[in-house]
């Protein structure tokens, strides 16, 4: 009985290691061109504890098309390849790609290892701003719901935004 109690107490006070990826920050710069296209650059400061890839969901592209997708890890450009979500950490190291799902696309890139890194993701989206009968509309989820310690977004354009611009978010 003493052994069982001792074992229980040891288990009770043993440190528990929880594996959880950490996204310290994501900063976005969106530059809107005159034709409604947007050039977007995101910087992710992250540390992986498990898994093999990072990804960003883009499930509602509607009439927009994604082009010029590139990823850098700590300033070094990764290589594009057809993405296979089932590949290992080693197989995804140094690569990025696009995963097509029934909901839309996921921008994927290999974690490489379980250390802290800065990833720079850049891409272009057509029809980022679209026309209606009486106005022009920008309606995007800049970053899907996730646990990010700090998020910032800066939107710039050839056009000077008036102080009376209606913005919701």
Name each model-derived stretch:
Residues 1-4:
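Positively charged n-region of N-terminal signal peptides that target proteins for export
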Residues 7-8, 18:
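Cleavable N-terminal signal peptides
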Residues 18-169:
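Lumenal/extracellular ectodomains and adaptor appendage modules
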Residues 11-12:
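Hydrophobic alpha-helical transmembrane segments of integral membrane proteins
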């Amino acid at each position: 009985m003493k052994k069982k109690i001792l074992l229980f107490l040891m288990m009770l006070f043993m440190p528990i290691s929880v594996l959880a990826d950490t996204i310290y920050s994501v900063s976005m710069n969106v530059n809107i061109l005159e034709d409604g296209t947007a050039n977007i650059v995101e910087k992710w400061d992250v540390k992986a504890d498990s898994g093999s890839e990072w990804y960003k969901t883009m499930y509602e592209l509607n009439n927009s098309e994604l082009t010029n997708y590139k990823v850098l890890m700590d300033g070094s450009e990764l290589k594009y390849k057809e993405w296979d979500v089932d590949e290992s950490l080693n197989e995804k190291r140094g690569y990025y790609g696009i995963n097509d799902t029934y909901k839309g696309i996921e921008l994927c890139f290999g974690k490489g290892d379980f250390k802290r890194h800065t990833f720079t993701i850049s891409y272009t989206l057509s029809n980022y701003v679209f026309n209606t009968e009486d106005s022009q509309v920008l309606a995007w989820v800049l970053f899907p719901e996730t646990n990010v310690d700090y998020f910032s977004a800066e939107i710039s354009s050839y056009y000077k935004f008036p102080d009376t611009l209606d913005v919701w978010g």
